[in-house]
């Protein structure tokens, strides 16, 4: 049995919000339930599985969302083998491990404390429910994404950092060589995925803003995370201090959670309209636009952009600057730019899954990415030959973080709706799970709404022409309409 989770984004607490402890409980409960179900075989008998491979598919530790970078003379886009850079990465990792003790304890417990256990089986293939349960070995593998890419760097300094991560998370991934970005960089992981006919990668490879020269270097998204989002929030809190009410402070803290990151300006504009007095609101918006201009002048951003620097800066300015917004078209225009940049439709990475060699040669039955924070299951192909059907499917592993999504009613002020999410993918081999090949679990938890908060409504009605009406067959018949 193979389980995959992605995009936990555990931070050092200097930006954004820490993951709730309950997330670890959900993961353990799901894995225990899935292990029990996987132990029922295709012939109807019960035979407990002996092993679960858990793949952490990148962006588990978020090494870029930290104000610690602002306190240092170095940045991730400097030479990563400078002592100052590796020391900063090490300090951030130490703080992440300390501040997220519940999540870390959960992952380590799965690997080392027998968290998942199953009843033994009788000779006739039935569970002995009253007997002491047997622990199931959990082998946890780590793959890097665009927020934890320094763990892909070689060298003694990074070996020491990986050693801490391996110890605290209970990984089977060797610490004395770079954590893999592609599965073939780690033979143990490669064999595990191949047994389950899965091709898995984080997916940042297909996002030019999150992947520049190679996976041993920074990207545009790192510059935006540190020099724009983290610096802006720190500056706003320092400049305005007590003028920020609790709701506005919370809105600023949540800025780091917004994905895609280019929607940060849209989120900030809408959040300030709801939470901040007019005078404070105007100052914050001007401060944001000023910092966007400063970031767009950075040499690092132009160097890492990978496309024409003028085109990139113009597009980033149009997406991020509140002063350049044009109402309901703002979010749509930003998403269209990202689609063109990534070569996708709707920001789904399906087109890239269709181009994978392992999909085209049918070696992989399942193509799995993360990165987008958007859980997906999309059928790719079904091949029929000699009575056998090979179905190939694309999955996105989603996220275990808060998500902000553009609303569909793009009338007036652009809005992003919030929810907390989790997503777990599971793949079976041979006769596990009664012969099934995969199972997915995705959950959404809506936000808590203060009882004193009244809904804010627009003073004007939304135009009705663009609203989808009831289907034709739902309308009343002519006879019915003629009745009094």
Where do the model's predicted regions map?
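Extended recognition/assembly regions associated with phosphoester-bond processing machinery
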Residues: 1-484
